[in-house]
């Protein structure tokens, strides 16, 4: 049986990546920092993926085990034996994962000659490159030559909504997911064979990454931040609000126009994709909380992420990103008390002022047109919804 090692045994790891790897015939070893989660996986040796739709389905994933990330002996054996290594740990953790992999790959080099593909499955642009660079930058010439010859680092675009929904479970590690998924993999970077059921191998990954980042992730964040302002608990409630749905649809139109010009994608294809995204948001079975989708606003409002990137692209090609900027402005009003990044943004606004805070988070110059438009929309939204 093929063997996979997956870093990150959370909901995405189990409900999306692990699920597809299992359906593709892999025996999966999850690696995680949570001792409790590792113990649960090793205790049950299986879990169920609950697919949320009109007729709820349940699919079992088995042939699994787990290793704690500090268990170097067993993790080393797993990496040596692996046919594929994947991650869903958050882009901020990829560098440290890459540094951990160096020693394990050196042991693999000394023991086995078969190729290996390593893929970061994260909501970030070309995330696998982060892993690859962190591995190569500390290697000697011989190790670098081995990595370049024997290890593939395909970038990926991944998409599946995995909410923290309260649903009856057989096992505590069961996970609920939406029916839709998409996993696009950079074909030219694969070494050897790579067969994952349901994944699509593509020649040019950038259009797929940006389409998903702008039209799904950007629209999701906009729905969450506006939904939070209007007092909605769930995404499916927020997207049914005419005011919110109009802004989200219009920001998708702006981003689609920019994508069409940059990548020569047919506008009809982008319209169909955007429409499908809105339909997914309306799924009432997901019960996806706006505070989950809006969490970590410092990251989501940063220069190369889901809102600022399409806004800047629009501006550079002469499109006014009016509705994308509403989403960004709403993000600076996201003051959820249990989110450390949201609290830090609000503290910075109080201590240093709105313009300096927006500049710090987004990377925009304080006197730039885009920043000043964000300020205007921030004040407009605050006046409309916060009356304080």
Curated annotation (Swiss-Prot):
Pfam family, one: Mannitol_dh
Reactions accelerated catalytically: D-mannitol 1-phosphate + NAD(+) = beta-D-fructose 6-phosphate + NADH + H(+)
Keywords (A to Z) from UniProt: NAD, Oxidoreductase
InterPro entries found in the cross-reference section: 6-PGluconate_DH-like_C_sf, 6PGD_dom2, Mannitol_1_phos_5_DH, Mannitol_DH, Mannitol_DH_C, Mannitol_DH_CS, Mannitol_DH_N, NAD(P)-bd_dom_sf
GO MF terms, alphabetically ordered: mannitol-1-phosphate 5-dehydrogenase activity
Classification via SUPFAM superfamilies: 6-phosphogluconate dehydrogenase C-terminal domain-like, NAD(P)-binding Rossmann-fold domains
E.C. designation(s): 1.1.1.17
Chain residues that bind NAD(+): 4-15
Protein name: Mannitol-1-phosphate 5-dehydrogenase
Source organism: Thermoanaerobacter sp. (strain X514)
UniProt gene name: mtlD
């Amino acid at each position: 049986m093929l063997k996979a090692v997956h870093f990150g045994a959370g909901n995405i790891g189990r409900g999306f990546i692990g699920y597809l790897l299992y359906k593709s015939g892999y025996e999966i070893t999850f690696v995680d920092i949570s001792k409790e989660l590792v113990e649960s996986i090793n205790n049950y040796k299986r879990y169920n993926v609950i697919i949320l739709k009109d007729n709820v389905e349940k699919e079992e994933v088995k042939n699994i085990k787990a290793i704690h990330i500090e268990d170097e002996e067993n993790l080393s054996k797993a990496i040596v034996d692996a046919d594929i290594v994947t991650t869903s740990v958050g882009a901020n953790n990829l560098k440290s994962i890459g540094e951990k992999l160096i020693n394990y790959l050196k042991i693999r080099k000394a023991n086995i000659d078969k190729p290996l593909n390593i893929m970061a499955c994260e909501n970030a642009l070309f995330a696998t490159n982060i892993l690859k660079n962190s591995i190569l930058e500390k290697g000697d010439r011989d190790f670098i030559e081995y990595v370049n010859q024997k290890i593939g680092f395909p970038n990926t675009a991944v998409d599946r909504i995995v909410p923290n929904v309260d649903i009856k479970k057989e096992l505590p590690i069961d996970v609920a997911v939406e029916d839709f998924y998409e996993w696009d993999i950079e074909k030219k970077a694969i070494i050897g064979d790579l067969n994952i059921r349901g994944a699509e191998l593509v020649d040019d990954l950038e259009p797929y990454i940006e389409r998903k980042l702008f039209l799904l992730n950007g629209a999701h964040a906009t729905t969450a931040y506006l939904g939070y302002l209007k007092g909605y608990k769930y995404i499916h409630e927020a997207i049914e609000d005419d005011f919110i749905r109009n802004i989200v649809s219009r920001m998708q139109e702006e981003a689609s126009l920019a994508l069409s010009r940059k990548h020569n994608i047919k506008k009809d294809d982008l319209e169909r994709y955007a429409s499908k995204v809105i339909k997914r948001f309306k799924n009432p079975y997901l019960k996806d909380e706006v505070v989950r989708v809006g969490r970590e606003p410092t990251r989501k409002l940063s220069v190369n992420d889901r809102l600022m990137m399409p806004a800047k692209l629009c501006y550079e090609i002469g499109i006014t990103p009016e509705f994308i900027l509403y989403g960004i402005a709403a993000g600076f009003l996201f003051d959820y008390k249990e989110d450390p990044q949201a609290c830090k943004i609000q503290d910075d606004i109080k201590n240093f002022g709105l313009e300096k805070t927006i500049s710090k988070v987004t990377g925009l110059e304080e006197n730039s047109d885009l920043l000043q438009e964000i300020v205007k929309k921030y004040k407009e939204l605050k006046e409309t919804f916060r009356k304080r």
